[in-house]
Amino acid sequence: MARGREAVTLLLVGWGYAPGMQTLEALDAVRRADVVYVESYTMPGSSWLYKSVVEAAGEARVVEASRRDLEERSREIVSRALDAVVAVVTAGDPMVATTHSSLAAEALEAGVAVRYIPGVSGVQAARGATMLSFYRFGGTVTLPGPWRGVTPISVARRIYLNLCAGLHTTALLDVDERGVQLSPGQGVSLLLEADREYAREAGAPALLARLPSVLVEAGAGGGHRVLYWSSLERLSTADVEGGVYSIVIPARLSGVEEWLLAAASGQRRPLEYDRSVYETVEENCKKGVYMEPV
C-alpha cells in the first residue's frame, strides 16, 4: 500500500477520550494504514486504547508506542512514512499533546504529507461539563508533578493573567512515566506554594487559595462527574478518590454561569465562595501587578 510523496502518508488520529467515541474518519484511517502506532502516555486512564484500535485495525499492523518512540525515535516513524501510510493514534485529540505537534513538524520538514483527524477532546469535554461559557476560557495550564523539580510560578502568573482578562482557567494534572496522574490535592498544593513565592516576588498578596474551583472527572464511558470546591485551599487538602481529573478555576462568574455551574455540580443552593477575592484581583490587575514576569 505504498504511496507517492504527494499522498497523505502520516495520519495523526484522535480516538476520542473514551470507548465508543471514535469517528468514522478515525476508523477508516486505521483500517487503511500500513502501520498504526498507538500511544496512551499523554492521556491518563487510556489503557483501553490499544485494545480498541486492535479491534478496528487488526493486531498485525498495530504497534504500542512508548514516550521514547514518539519523542526520541520519531525519526524512525517519519522515515517509515516516506513510503507507507503511517497512523499515530492517541486518546482524545492528537493536537492537544505537544508531542504530536513536534512529530507533524518533523514529518513536514522531511517532505511527508500530514493529515490531522480530530477526536473528541477530554479537555474540551471537561470544560463543557461545567456548563461555563466556551468563550470565557483562557490559556490552559498544566500543574507539574514534583518529579519535574520545578516550582510552577509561571502557572500561577498565567492564572492571574486569565483572571485579569475575565477568563476561566483549565488546569491539567501532570502524568509521570508510568502514566499515573498527579493527584488533584498534591497538584493544587504545589500551585499554592508557587503562588506564595510569586506573591513575594511580585509584592502582592497570594490570592489563588481563596478562588473557587471545579474538579471534573472523566468517566470511562464518556460521562463526567463535576465536583465543586469553594476554594482551592480546601481542594488542596481534600482526599479525592482515584480517577482522571481536570481542574477549572473560574473567573468572576456571571449570574447565568453561576446557576449553571451549581446545576452541573449537583448543588441545591447558591454556590458558596469568597466573592471579594475577585475585587482584590481586579485592583491588582489595574495596577499592572501581574503584567511583568518575575
Curated annotation (Swiss-Prot):
The protein's Enzyme Commission number: 2.1.1.98
Keyword S-adenosyl-L-methionine set for record: yes
Domain of life: Archaea
Signal peptide boundaries: none
Keyword annotations of the record: Methyltransferase, S-adenosyl-L-methionine, Transferase
GO biological process: methylation; protein histidyl modification to diphthamide
Recorded metabolic or biological pathway in which this protein acts: Protein modification; peptidyl-diphthamide biosynthesis
An example molecular function term from Gene Ontology annotations: diphthine synthase activity
Keyword S-adenosyl-L-methionine annotated: yes
Record's subunit section: Homodimer.
Function: S-adenosyl-L-methionine-dependent methyltransferase that catalyzes the trimethylation of the amino group of the modified target histidine residue in translation elongation factor 2 (EF-2), to form an intermediate called diphthine. The three successive methylation reactions represent the second step of diphthamide biosynthesis.
Name listed for the protein in its UniProt record: Diphthine synthase
